[in-house]
Amino acid sequence: MKKIWGILLVLLLLCMTGCGSSPKSAQQATPQKIELSVFAALGLKDVLIDIQKEYEAKHPDVKIIYNFAATGVLQKQIGQGAPADVFVTAAAKNMDDMVEQKLVIANTRRDIVSNDLVLIVNKESGLDLHSFADLANDEVKRVGIGAPETVPAGQYAIDVMKFLGIWDRVKEKAVQTKDVITVRSYVETGNVEAGVVFYTVAVTSNKLKVVATAPKGSHPPIVFPGAVVANSKQSQAAETFLDYLVSPEGMRVFQKYGFSPLK
């Protein structure tokens, strides 16, 4: 009988110890991280992944989840109700449209950085190209540009060629792609002889050379704006992230990748 009482006493003590430690364990439980969904233009992929490392180190309660694609594709996804918190585009016009459609919160808009539009060829190319106007030459057979309906760099490219009066001669040579990264890839592999991309996309490849920069005034200013998506459930955290992008810390990373601060 004493043996039975001893066993029961031990079990009771164990139960009391377990119950007593439960609140403490609950208090020590790791708080759930805020998941921030950022829809961003594909040309920003490298720099934003770098920024993510720094941002999450400074904000351990936040986990950033990126969706990279052509600006127009992302715009359509958000318009169809895709869950997103932040939208960063490669053109002011796209953001203007989003504001007008009330798909983003207008007063959270931040104009982040600028970029240049450049003409690229393969380093092994024998083409004698020195300017965008040279794309009209007969020796150039195929020119890669982003599809203007969804890729801002593609629309900028057409703007430049119309400005120079050569679009009618170049449009038959134009190979339209789903994004600027594909344009770069096509030039690297020889699928096209030349391509038009953002400067920051060109300089990440060691197989290409920049032969010309679009003349000033030949296209609208290239600005990369960001804003909080209207249906975001993390609007405060989203705006804090946008503030970081335009902060000195964020701008330092952007400049490392070739982007220019806005003047």
Indicate residue ranges for each PLM-predicted region:
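Periplasmic-binding protein-like
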Residues: 85-89
